[in-house]
Every structure is written in structure tokens, then in C-alpha cells.
């Protein structure tokens, strides 16, 4: 995004500041890039139902631009002349409902960080400007439906969790930016650019992206830390997919294209903290979360906090599920590692229904894949393990994370002083640059095919750059860990923190900041990282579930008073329930309007008229929706801070907003004390969660050694362990070792150190590396001291006629709703 090719074939730096002027017949936007070059964009106002945009190919100086504006003013004096409308920082896009077009602008921005010398911004204020003027008649400009559509658009609060950069491709991971650099319009077609639809018209007209910004929705946070006197910066980025996006109970599972709800890519970048933010060594690692890729749903209920889960469609060949995993391979390469955290056994089957079908789907898909490309999985009932008072779940999750890291590796890149970071971003072929040729029917969405070229481009780059600048070859991440629970919020966030914790030690080790790739759980670095992941979890939960995440584990680690934690969890359960039951329908409509999933047409039903129709005719991608077809609202998952309930973020809109339903919910609250909310955390708090004083490691026996084959759900599943414990099933990690009580062996990290020492050597087969560890690495046990003892009952005698859940709450002080 640092440059774009205009219609004259000239490469121009990104425009970053703009002024919008108006006459009675046209808008004129003046943009400049900070280097003294000014450009002019003209937008016609006489036919507001059509988007007529033209760009002046002339590159003006400041003086020439001033003279041009003066001439325009003189020529329009009879109709009021040229007037300044606003200063702005980029065009978000254009949208049309039933009447005229509207232009969305960023009028205020705030700096939130830097990536390798490139500034990253968030939106502080936005404005919507109607293209028509008061003298032009527009039949639908002030109609009731038109105003309601504008109010829906205004519900999208662009000041919450949207971010962008003029010169760095924040919608792509650092590895993709280095190994397959892209510019221009292709970037807007990625799955993480939320204003792709809104910018489609102007990009098609101008065949460049000089005037627009690509908005990413999710989370961005940086922290500067120090270890042994060495400063480094950690950046945590979450990118939410625009595909199958929506609110929690209205978007669940997978659609027919293989897109899952709540699909979020999380990237953890660690780099040297140096002046001017030009680090010489950088490491990044990517993980993924997403809804279970099956056709399933849950009805929103105002009387039931725990609605039933329904498998709405069973595919004999699991085509949509297969498409989803094919897409993950195209995005990240092999192997795909699935960490499935949902429940195994329930009094009334809910999550377990999906677990069984998910196991079937993975097994069916694996039968058609070569052994080296099969899906790796760990079905691990996190709720059950958290309820066990003898297990340190974070340490166990770190074991899983370390095994996954050994299979996928991480990305490491070194730049010498002879090579700038901009040079490193251009290692791939120049043919990837934007040519300016845009076809409305072509798409490079989702970075499909990018990973196939990583090795080839990296190899070519060695010959081009490494020989001249003495740059060490990079380490490449190939594959990804995909984590899910039911909502992919609370349990998933704990698991993602464990993965980030394991990765951070290895990233600091490969950067030479730490001598060993192991970080204890009570290390200040782990605590700082926990704060970042907790904040990310809250943000993503607000976007998807309507409340902050259930963070009982993190609260316990901070030493928060248990009663305060219980109250906090209870209030978050109520907040999530209320938003899901009463607010999500309008929020879903707002998302669909913003993303272009629904496009209003005159004479056709409005989006709010289709809600009941959608409930009776289709759910979760079962309805056939072509690219040019109108949309029928679907039920599924996601919510967000991104939706502004007061409907004011687009400040130019002054219409009176319709009030949201304000029905009381006293009746449902009567059931809260005995109905467990599926939205609440399924993670009981236990002090032993905080007791990891040592780092996980490799088992004594070979990781892929002799395993027991168990016939399960009609197919052969790899099962580790002596008993048929259905809470834990895996084909890539030894469950018996995972649950063992001696998690302090060092072989895993010994192997990691060996990989670091051999950084410049060619990367060997990932699976062979793992097998080699199991065969050769001895295990050494350490005694890990604990900062506190395991949790004990309070000693209160409880009557036997009370329910088990109540007795457990009295004995262990846990929340009734969990």
C-alpha cells in the first residue's frame, strides 16, 4: 500500500491527507502525500444516483493546486463558488440505498503504533456526506426506508477496533508481506478488509487505491518490554474475516463456501525495539480461531440462556468442511492442527453433538489426503480438565502449543544495515505489484495460493538480496494451529494465550534475547503477555458475543478477589444474554449493510422485513446466495463493539434514530440462578492453574511412536493412552504424556535450541524433526516449586439434599453461572 499505479501508469506514493471542497455541481478532493505532490479528484453531484468519479492525471505543486482551486471558485461564483467541506484522512467508500450515493470519510485519526517504520492508525471520527445537492430532486432521498437504512449504517461504529496503514499491509501477516509482497487493488479483496464492498465502485472507476484506506477490523496493540537489558517490542494483531460475519446466535458454523463464523487470524510479532523502528531481527507467529465448520445453529431465546444446538444440515461428503480446511491450507500451508475444546459428556447433549460430527468430518476428510497432509487434531474437553483440581491446565495447553510450534515452526527474518525494511518487503517478484488493471469479476481474496510460493520466492530472494546484503535466510511458518470451542471466545482465548506464551519464549530465543526458549508462567514477561491476550479476548468477545470475555483464569492469575471475579462473570453473562436476545437483530442488519451482504433495491423487501423469512427458510449458509443476488438474513454468531448503539459515529447523520427494543427481562432473570449460560465461561477457577513453575517438554516415548488404534464413531481414530477417555483424542500429541504429572522435561526446548543453532541450514521435514526428538532426546525432570498450594474445599459441611452444582459452589467458591 506504500504506492499505487494510476491510470497513466505512473507510480505514486499513498495520499495521506485530503481536503474536500464543493460547488453546486461537483465535489473536489485535494490529496497530498507529504512529498509536495498534489492530486485532484472530481465527483459529480448532478446525477446522485450514479457514481461519476474522475481523477486528474496531473501532478500539481502546492502553488499550482492553489491556482486551480482559485479558477474553480471564479468559475462558480454565480452559484456560490467553491466551499471547503472538511479536512479528512481517506475515503472509506461509497454506498447507495434507495436514493443517492453517500461518501464515507475519515475526518479524525489517531496513531496507535508503528510496524517497521510504518505508522498504523485507528479511526477517531468519521462522517457521511450525501453526494446530491439541495437543487437536485431525488425521489427517495428522504423516504422513511432510506432514513432507516442510513440509521443502520450509522450503527457501525468505525471508531471501535478498526485500524489501517497508508504504507504497510496490515491486512496481511508479516510473512506474507515479506515473501509475497502485493500492492494496490488486490489488497482490498482480501478477507480481512472490511470496506472492500464500499470501495469497489471507486476502485473500479479509477483503477487505483490512492484515495481510499483499507480498514481491518479486530485488535491491534503494542507493548515495549525488556529482558536482560535488551529492549524488544511485541505486537499483537487480530484480523477478523468479513466472510460469514455477524452476531453470535445469527452466525454459526460454516456456509456453503467453506467460510466459518468468527474467523479471526491472530499474529504475534516480536522485534528488536530500536530507534526509528527499523529492527534488524523480526519474528512472527500466526494462529487462527473459527467456528466449528459444520452446518449448525442455535435459536436466539429471551427465555432460555442455554438454547439447544441443532445440526441443521448433514453433508455426506462434508464438502463445506473440506472447503474450509482447503482454504486454511491455501492461506497457511500444511499442517493444519485442530485444537477442539468443546465438551465430551453432558447431561443434555449439546456441544457433544457437534464434537461427534466434527470427529466424523475430520476422519472422512483425512481418508482422501496423503499422510503428510492429513489434518492433525486434538479433541480435548477443556471444561473437564479445568474442573479437575489436580491439573495445571495452562501448563498442559503450553505442551500442546509447543508440539504445534514444532510442526509449523515460526517466521524469523533478519535484515542487515545494508538493507532497509522496505527492501525486505520487496523481495518477491515485481510482477506482484499493482498493474492498475482491475476486473470486477476477478479476485485474489484470502491470499489463496500465497503459501505455495513462499519457498520459491524465498529461494529466489536469497540469490537477489542475501548475497549482496549478507541477510540470513528466513525461517518460514508452514501450517497453523486452529483453535475452537463453541463460541470461540472464552476457552479459545485461554488456549490462544498458552500458544502465545509458548511462542514468545521461542521468538525471544531465536532473536538472541533469551538464552533458553522457556518462560515460566509467573515470569513478568508471561504476565505482560497475559494482559495483552486478555485485552484482545475482551475486544473480540465484544465484537462477537456482546460482552467482554469470561476471564476467570486471568483474574485468578492476577490474584483478584474471588467474590469480585464471581460478580464480574455474572454481570458479563447477563450483558451477553441481553445483547444476544434483544440487540443482535439490528446489529446483524447493520453488518450486512456495511459489508454489502444485503443491497437494497427499489420494489424489493427491506432487510428488516426478511428476518422472519430467514428464520423459516434457511440458516447458516444453507440459502443459495449468488454474488449478484439479494441476501436473505441468516442465523449465526458474532457481535461487536463495532456496532454503535447510539447510532452517532457517522457524525453528519442528524436524523432521529429509532429506539432499540427496551423490553424488560425480569422474567428471564429468574432462571439465571439455575440455567447455565452457554455464553458464560466453562472454566472453573482453580489455584493450581497458576502453579506452572516449569516448562513443558517432549514425552519420554516417541511423539509419533506406537499408538493404540480405537474404532470410534465408525472410523479408526488415533487414540493415545491406556483407557478410552473420550475427553482426549489426538493424532499428533501423546495424551498420556500430556496428562502426566511431570511436565518439566526439557527435550522439547532442547530441540528448539538445536533448530535455532541451525537457523541458516535448510529446514528439514517438520514431521521428521518431531520424530527425531522423540527417539533421541532424553528427558530430565525438574522439581517445580509452587507459588501457592492446590485449591482445597472450604471445610463447610453441606446438606446432602442440595444439588451437586450448589455444593461445589459452596465448597470451592465458584460462580453459579459458568
From Swiss-Prot:
<keyword id="KW-0378">Hydrolase</keyword>
<dbReference type="InterPro" id="IPR002013">
    <property type="entry name" value="SAC_dom"/>
</dbReference>
<feature type="region of interest" description="Disordered">
    <location>
        <begin position="759"/>
        <end position="800"/>
    </location>
</feature>
<feature type="short sequence motif" description="Phosphatase catalytic core">
    <location>
        <begin position="482"/>
        <end position="493"/>
    </location>
</feature>
<keyword id="KW-0926">Vacuole</keyword>
<protein>
    <recommendedName>
        <fullName>Phosphoinositide phosphatase SAC3</fullName>
        <ecNumber>3.1.3.-</ecNumber>
    </recommendedName>
</protein>
<feature type="compositionally biased region" description="Polar residues">
    <location>
        <begin position="759"/>
        <end position="780"/>
    </location>
</feature>
<feature type="domain" description="SAC">
    <location>
        <begin position="153"/>
        <end position="546"/>
    </location>
</feature>
<feature type="region of interest" description="Disordered">
    <location>
        <begin position="426"/>
        <end position="459"/>
    </location>
</feature>
<keyword id="KW-0472">Membrane</keyword>
<dbReference type="GO" id="GO:0043813">
    <property type="term" value="F:phosphatidylinositol-3,5-bisphosphate 5-phosphatase activity"/>
</dbReference>
<dbReference type="Pfam" id="PF02383">
    <property type="entry name" value="Syja_N"/>
</dbReference>
<comment type="function">
    <text>The PI(3,5)P2 regulatory complex regulates both the synthesis and turnover of phosphatidylinositol 3,5-bisphosphate (PtdIns(3,5)P2).</text>
</comment>
<feature type="compositionally biased region" description="Basic and acidic residues">
    <location>
        <begin position="789"/>
        <end position="800"/>
    </location>
</feature>
<dbReference type="GO" id="GO:0005774">
    <property type="term" value="C:vacuolar membrane"/>
</dbReference>
<dbReference type="InterPro" id="IPR043573">
    <property type="entry name" value="Fig4-like"/>
</dbReference>
<dbReference type="GO" id="GO:0046856">
    <property type="term" value="P:phosphatidylinositol dephosphorylation"/>
</dbReference>
<comment type="subunit">
    <text>Component of the PI(3,5)P2 regulatory complex at least composed of ATG18, SAC/FIG4, FAB1 and VAC14.</text>
</comment>
